[in-house]
Amino acid sequence: CRVDGEDLLALSHREIAKRVAFVAQHVPDTQMTVHDMVMLGRRPYMTWGVTEHDHHVVHEAMRYLNLEDMRGRFLNRLSGGERQKVMLARALAQEPTLLLLDEPTSSLDIRNQYQVLQITRDLCREQDLTAMIVIHDLNLALRFCDRFLLLREGEVYRYGGAEIFDADALRDVYGVKGSIVQVQGQSLVLIEDEEKEKIS
């Protein structure tokens, strides 16, 4: 695996952490403050302590995610959406070129799902980042992602743009009968109801 032309397997853990940031599916339920959690994103760069540059990067990450007013609050007192934004800020503080996100919307309500993915997309466009997201909600994926990799039984089934989604893909990968429709210029997946066995 190469990032910016460099073989990640040839790099130390510290150097990998400077290039790749990970946002987990479940946010830790801890009494750590928002500021301290975001500061953890600077660990790959720290030697003898926290520098002025570290403070600046953390401040900018929290400002970007609108977290400045909650810098002193504990994570276990925040909503699921707020926690996920904190983890995005921590990832941003790493100054990576690649963001890895594992089901970042799985435990969020619809409003926070859209907010988190919108922020992630904006981050990629404004900070020139690449994001790889594991996500099972196809409609969210079609709305916010540019390229798609479909897996079937551990093997690559298809890779490409939104055009890779069709009735065959829905059947082969997800085991459902459905189709892709356009609504106000947006691709949506419609799943047909399974036919119930007739009772004789």
PLM features: residue spans?
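ABC ATPase NBD Q-loop/coupling interface
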Residues: 1-15
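Conserved switch/coupling elements of ABC/ABC-like ATPase nucleotide-binding domains
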Residues: 7, 28, 149, 153-164
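Conserved ABC ATPase "signature" region
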Residues: 52-70, 95
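Hydrophobic anchor residue at the start of the ABC signature
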Residues: 88-89, 116
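ABC ATPase nucleotide-binding domains
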Residues: 167, 173-200
